[in-house]
Design a protein with these regions (language model features):
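Hydrophobic alpha-helical transmembrane segments in multi-pass integral membrane proteins
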Residues: 92-93, 98, 102, 141-147, ...
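Membrane helix-loop-helix hairpins that form the core translocation module of multi-pass transporters
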Residues: 45-118
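Interfacial loop-to-transmembrane junctions
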Residues: 210-232
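Alpha-helical multi-pass membrane helix bundles of inner-membrane/thylakoid proteins
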Residues: 116-138
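Membrane-interface helix caps of multi-pass small-molecule transporters
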Residues: 21, 25, 37, 87, ...
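Residues within membrane-spanning alpha-helices of integral membrane proteins
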Residues: 9, 52, 105-109, 113, ...
C-alpha cells in the first residue's frame, strides 16, 4: 500500500491496539482482526510473521497470569489432536481442492455461531465421537490455511463454561501451537530488520490493549462473554465465506 511511512505505522498500531483488546478479553480473535489490515499495509508474509509473534506474546502472558485455570490433561489432549491434524493438513494442502473445503468450513462455523446466538446454548460438552473430529478438523484447517482457530473455539466453548477457564486454556493452546508457525517463519528468513521494527512499534499499543482487555474481562458477566465469543465466531465464519 503506497502510503507515507508514518501513516502506515499509525494504522498498524491501531490494528494491533483494537485487535488485542479483544485478544486479551477472550483469548482469541486477535489474529483474525489484525491480519487483514496488516496484509494490506506490509504484505502477507510480513503480516503473518509479526502478528503471529504479537499474538504469541499476549497468549503467553494470559497463560502465565491465569495458570490456575488451566486444565493440563485437557490441554494436552487438545494439543495432541491439533498437532496430528496440522500434520495431515500440511500434507492435504497439495492434494485437496481448497475451493471446496473453505466454504464448507465457513458454513460450519456460521451455523454453530448462529445456533448458540439465537437458541439457548447446550450445557453439555461435546461427546467424544464429535470432539475428536472437531479437534482433528481444527488442526487440519490450521495446517492448510493457518486459520483453524474458529473450529477450535467451537470445541473449547463446549468444554469450558467458565470465562476464566476458557480464556486461559485457549491462550495456552495458541502459546504452544504458534511456536510451530514462529519456527517456520524463522526458517523462511522473515525475522529481518522490518520485522523487528514493526514488533517494536507494536509493543506500546499492545501493552495498553492487554491492560484494557483484562479490565473489560473482569467487568462482563458469563452470558455477555458467551455472546461475544459466538459473535466473534460468526464474524470469523463470515470472513471465510467472503
Amino acid at each position: 500500500m503506497g502510503l507515507p511511512v508514518f501513516i502506515k505505522m499509525g494504522l498498524f498500531m491501531a490494528a494491533v491496539f483494537i485487535s488485542n483488546i479483544v485478544q486479551a478479553l477472550t483469548g482469541f480473535a486477535g489474529v483474525m482482526l489484525s491480519i487483514p489490515p496488516t496484509i494490506l499495509l506490509y504484505g502477507p508474509d510480513m503480516a503473518k510473521a509479526v502478528i503471529n509473534v504479537i499474538c504469541w506474546l499476549v497468549c503467553a502472558y494470559l497463560m502465565v497470569k491465569n495458570r490456575e485455570y488451566i486444565n493440563k490433561k485437557e490441554l494436552g489432549r487438545i494439543i495432541l489432536f491439533m498437532l496430528i491434524g496440522m500434520a495431515a493438513g500440511i500434507y492435504l494442502y497439495n492434494i485437496v481442492d481448497a475451493r471446496i473445503l473453505v466454504p464448507v468450513y465457513g458454513l460450519l462455523i456460521v451455523g454453530v455461531a448462529l445456533k448458540n446466538l439465537l437458541l439457548k446454548p447446550s450445557v453439555a460438552s461435546l461427546p467424544v465421537w464429535v470432539a475428536i473430529p472437531v479437534l482433528l478438523g481444527a488442526g487440519i484447517i490450521h495446517g492448510m490455511f493457518a486459520s483453524g482457530g474458529a473450529l477450535l473455539v467451537v470445541y473449547l466453548a463446549s468444554a469450558f463454561r467458565d470465562k476464566n477457564s476458557f480464556r486461559a486454556n485457549v491462550a495456552s493452546v495458541w502459546t504452544v501451537l504458534n511456536l510451530v508457525l514462529m519456527f517456520t517463519d524463522y526458517e523462511k528468513g522473515l525475522y529481518n530488520t522490518e520485522f523487528f521494527e514493526l514488533l517494536g512499534i507494536g509493543v506500546i499499543p499492545l501493552v495498553i490493549a492487554v491492560y484494557l482487555g483484562n479490565k473489560i474481562h473482569s467487568m462482563i458477566n458469563q452470558q455477555m462473554f458467551n455472546r461475544l465469543t459466538y459473535g466473534l465466531l460468526l464474524a470469523a465464519g463470515s470472513m471465510i465465506l467472503v
